[in-house]
């Protein structure tokens, strides 16, 4: 079963093969804290962009994470990211897609527990 989502203006949309994970993630790094993400993680093969009319990319610090956002309405869409472990380490090859769960159709934040990752001190 696939789930879908889109930005506020609808110019960018995506589909995911699968469901919302049991837990979502909130990172405390400077970028995620300011943007208010709740992330749902997926392997790249399970995620596809179905519309990208105003997709823009922001990279910072080590430039290893591509943060996609809508240049029209400003919604954060997803990040193509290393598959960081809880301690901040990475194997150098495995990637994941961190979807802003708030954009998933019919998403209810209260329905899922949230794990906090201490990105403020890890990277």
Describe these PLM feature segments.
Residues 1-123:
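A short Gly-Trp-Pro
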